[in-house]
Amino acid sequence: MAESAKLLFYNKVIDGTAIKQFIGRLVAHFGITYTAHILDQLKTLGFQQATYAATSLGIDDLLTAPSKGWLIQDAEHHSYTLEKHHRYGNVHAVEKLRQLIETWYATSEYLKQEMNPNFRMTDPLNPVHMMSFSGARGSASQVHQLVGMRGLVSDPQGQIIDLPIKSNFREGLSLTEYIISCYGARKGVVDTAVRTSDAGYLTRRLVEVVQHIVVRKTDCNTFRGISLNSTEDKKKNLQIFTQQKLVGRVLADNLYINARCLAIRNQDINTNLIEKLITLKTPLISIRSPLTCKSMLWICQLCYGWSLTHYGDLVELGEAVGIIAGQSIGEPGTQLTLRTFHTGGVFTGDIAEHVRTPFNGTIEFDTDLVYPTRTRHGHPAWVCRTDLAVTIKSQNKIHNLIIPSQSLLLIQNNQYVESKQLIAEVHAKVSPFKEKVQKYIYCNIEGEMHWSKRVRHASKYLHSNVHLIFNTGHLWILSGSSHEDKTSSMFFKNQDQINTKFFISPRKILFMKKTNQVNSKNLDPYLEKEMETLNYSNLYLGILNKSRNFVYPSIILHDYEVKRIYDEKKGENFLLLEERHGEKKTQIFRRFVLNIPKSGILENKDIFAISNDPGYGIQSPGIIKYGTIKVNPIKGKGETFKNRETKILRLRPRYQVIEPGNFFPIPEEVHILYESFPPILVRNDSLIKKNTQITSDIRSQVGGLVRIRRKMNDSYEVKVLPGRVYHPEERRNISKQNDILVPPGEEISNKFQSENWLYLEWITPPKEKPFIFIRPAIEFIVPEETDLAETFTLNSQKKQEILKVKKIRYLLYEDGEEVEVTNKTGIQLIQTGLVLDWKEDSSIKKVYASLTEIETNGLSKKFLQISLIEHPIFEIEKKKNNVNLKYLFTNEINYSSHSFNYENGLFNGYRGIIRISSNENQEDKSLPILSPFDFVQIFLSKNSEEYTPEMKDEGNFNLDTNSIFYAKSFVKKFNQNSITSSQNSSGTFINKEFYNHNNINQEFNSRKIIRNFFLSIERNFMEILLLRKLGLLGNSHSLPSPFQFSCWANTHNQPIINRYSILENLRDVFQVPKWYFFDENKKTHKLDLSKNSIYHLLTWSFSIALSYEEGAIHLVGLGQFICENISISSKYQTISESGQIIAIHPEFLVVRLAKPSLATGGATIHSHYGQIIKKGDVLITLVYERLKSGDIIQGLPKVEQLLEARPINSTSINLENGFENWNRDMTKSLGSLWGFLLSAKTTMNQSQINLVDQIQEVYQSQGVYISDKHIEIVVRQMTSKVLTLEDGMANGFLPGELIESSRAQRMNRVLEESVLYKPILLGITKASLNTQSFISEASFQETTRVLAKAALRGRIDWLKGLKENVIFGGVISAGTGCQEVVWQVILEKRKETYSKRKKNKLFSGRVRDVFSYYQRILFFPTMKIIHKTLKKPLSEINLDPNYRK
């Protein structure tokens, strides 16, 4: 018993941490027994006081803070405002999520802070208040969920759910809040079901891998240890660091402070020594660890340290520390997701401090030193380029301050600020580690994509629809329901009005005839989907004049059959054209690979099918030299290839063979070395032999001249030119023999004749005599071929040639060009292609390629068809419902019995407008031109003078200036007498644009145009009717601007009045307004038909009534985007919906609904401009930064990932400290003979420590504290194996075999030839399946495989582990009462006794000691005698140490 003067007296409130320290001091001073007695007295005292106080807890004791109501209301108002800004396009999804999370987190934390003052003011003796804030039970976070609000919850993946739980458990949760609560709660339904099973399986694996680890010896005599730097992490408290890391450990080396020994080796570290270390600030301490224990199958006392159950004492011999370690790590697995929802997992930035103004005033600074940006919440801000001087001026005061560089200014120059207003956010000096994360934004409406000029129109990758956004801008989705037309025949044209339930496009059109039937199916390219079926007698070219239907002329390549081939190497399908000519015996067979774009659109000189000519390929690189062959370059698109230096795809030109002849590849050997300083062993312009060493691992395949050239990216090109060197005697005519080809039999310099083709090259090396280098040449002969003359032509009715498909042969390399061979694949030199050809002055611009299946006599074949898209000579008068087919016939066909199949047809159920979107494969992605006729301009008033204004932009009022499409009018000066109209033979007006029915006829209104108008929200029935009768969207009946004119055409006083005409009383003229839509580059584009159309458009439109009172407002233009909540006039309400103006009327506007989306710089768009996207499609990928943390894989999955040694994508967070440790350790081994071995060992040791720290970090981040010794035991087993490297049959090991590290070291001491191995990190599952006990392995996993493998190898299980003995019913070799442990204790005591006697007594004889590396003579039993003795009964055991049997 200690004296009373030394007892400690506490006169303060004791929390949980103080209780732990108090119990630790009691154990250290008085021992476990007396400490337990004191704690029993404290327990009794506590129960007595609780009984006297009669404290109880009821539901009425849960008092909610009265401020919760207005706090929740304020947060909801902020969330509603944020949602509106997101709908307006002011913030994107990530900024919205950040603000939402921080708003609700701040609300939850403020409510938590209000909880304690509320209890103190209203009910200080409240049981909940006393319990939680006294530290006895519960915490503020748990009570906050009872009386405050639950707040934000994370899902099982660690992502925060943006819908907060506003209720608490006292108020009760709604159904939605309960389901969300189940995800992140400690005992939630979802969490319990998943985490319990995972944690149990993790515990089983951990116990399996360390079950045999038992404390067997007192000291393993190791001199190794791990170094702990107490000053490494300055953020942690030094006292907490030393308490967790050092207390209970054993020093691995003497500890010196200023040449004074503070502690000796093998001394345990207690609290007194810790206080000295803290006072002296010892930087580096080496301690013993289970990671450095020399014992192979067990562990020693000193490497383990203190027992965690007996404070201050070393662990006892026989204690199964392995099972304790496995259970200690696995059991808290169910707690790893406990406290996630308490903090809400808030997005935090790297803002260190805020700068606020001291008083009211005006702020001034230099605007040239800042540039604009957006905060992480989407608010406008300015970044300081350098340190910025800011001045705040008021009437009587001036305050100057300096804003550091890279800080955010939240105010503008000359802005009035109030006192304590936040004006800047200063970034932290050391920015935390961040990672870039991608977030996909999905489209929530169906419609058409449009974007601003801030988007790169070219795709990010080749053949991709991903576009990059340079700066912050908007995307617009114009609403509409899409319909993908599987056929090219549309019965309606762009902007046609459709009645309710009107038939749009059928799937089949059947024409029946009684004669020979040939079934033709039109196939979609690449997909081969049936689209149309036609029955007819003969196949030919021409025009269907009978039914006045408009069809396009076509060519069918009947000599080329289309077949589908599957390439197994590439895993792709290819369409091939098989060419067959002549009889079966003399048949010409050739295959062409189709090279047609997905759209099927081809241009002039396009090569749409390619065939490799056999016999014109080479396997080695070289240069091409032309002989007698003559070529011409082919204009048009070339073949893409990747440059070896720049890695950029470029177009390779083609060279058509116009005269046959020969050409010659000159072979050479090429090596590309990509190292910065390659060890090249040959000199430039030197001669080498075959198999000469070029580098350390490259030998030359041929002998010849070496040419070395430095290329881009620090690479070198080494060429070996095969050939011979000839030094001529006379150099006069040498220039004539340079760069020439010598045929066989011709003399060279009148000295010798050539047997084959040779290539002569004059070489002038530096500091040496010039010479002629004679190189071999390979001859390729290109003969004349008759099949090249065969062509397919399309002629008009006047036998004029319109289109021609011909076959050409071309070379891929020009004279003198180098041929590069990559990946040891052959290079084709000559190809044959099918090319389109028409005259340059022809009106044909493009043609369309498709597949046609023709079936005759039960045999079906596919052919390629080339169709004209548009040609003037085939234009005829178009009636309603014109059919646009791909088939063409010239003779008359009897259509006496034809019918339309309406099955599975598409009907329009609403009144709407057909809107053809732009083709996604076109280069110009823009809005179409809405001009259905050829127009001439006349003036609105007969008395007005001729006036030709210039093109002028309309005023706009949209705040989003980046997303405006300007509406303009092109006005040309015409003489009214020059107005003409084209007519055909019957005198009918020709409609050159494909416009079918419901053409809009607007009557000329001579009333004065009202210039000024403004919006109104009034809607009446007449305006809605007028909207339905509008017809062609984009037409306006009168225009507000003097620079816009209605364009109308004179039809020789024969007006075409439509039934939807607005004014039918004036029939003297025919008026058609003309409007242009412009893209962001302010260019107009032609109307482009596409397979995708949008209909039911008016269903997603709304009208805004206009009134023409005085007081001008902002002018609006056609095609202009307007945002929601924008007011055109200050007198009237704001616009209720965002959209695009698609029609203007004097009394109202028609706005097509649209959804704006904000995208920041660096984001990508996943659709082409004008493409139709559906609801749920990926719209944008936003790229943003967030703090690197364990939010992605957190808790139990993170621990499992580390323990299973699974590779992770991200690098270590603490890279800087890791490099410092590596630098400190590796500098010792550099320059040493065994440096590479020491470096591998040091790297493995550092990896062990890093793995322990990462596992510990996951547990500590969620409030679970585990001793490092437990984790080190597991990591020791994960790193205890090594992998043999080479054939070790001589030493008994196979390559790739896993053996114990200590066993490999002992074998290397004995064997003459050392075993080469490398360290390896195994996961706990794999480590459990690679132990010395096959019984333990078979009981864990893969029982059949393990037992079969053990039987084949003849393995022996020595039953050294605990699990093996339990399986066979034996006594486990663990526990302090185990006989083997008792013997071990006796042996340890006798070793100490004999060691002391050794100093005074010498012994004779030499006996090998199996327990030590030194030669000692000891008379005590060996381990073999111990195991034999333990098998006997206890009564027969003689404990006499001198007894020998």
Swiss-Prot record:
Molecular-function annotations in GO: DNA binding; DNA-directed RNA polymerase activity; zinc ion binding
Protein's cellular compartments: Plastid, Chloroplast
Cofactor annotation: Zn(2+)
Catalytic activity entry: RNA(n) + a ribonucleoside 5'-triphosphate = RNA(n+1) + diphosphate
Family of the protein in this entry: Belongs to the RNA polymerase beta' chain family. RpoC2 subfamily.
Functional summary from the UniProt entry: DNA-dependent RNA polymerase catalyzes the transcription of DNA into RNA using the four ribonucleoside triphosphates as substrates.
Name of protein: DNA-directed RNA polymerase subunit beta''
Organism this protein belongs to: Anthoceros angustus (Hornwort)
Lineage of source species: Eukaryota, Viridiplantae, Streptophyta, Embryophyta, Anthocerotophyta
Gene: rpoC2
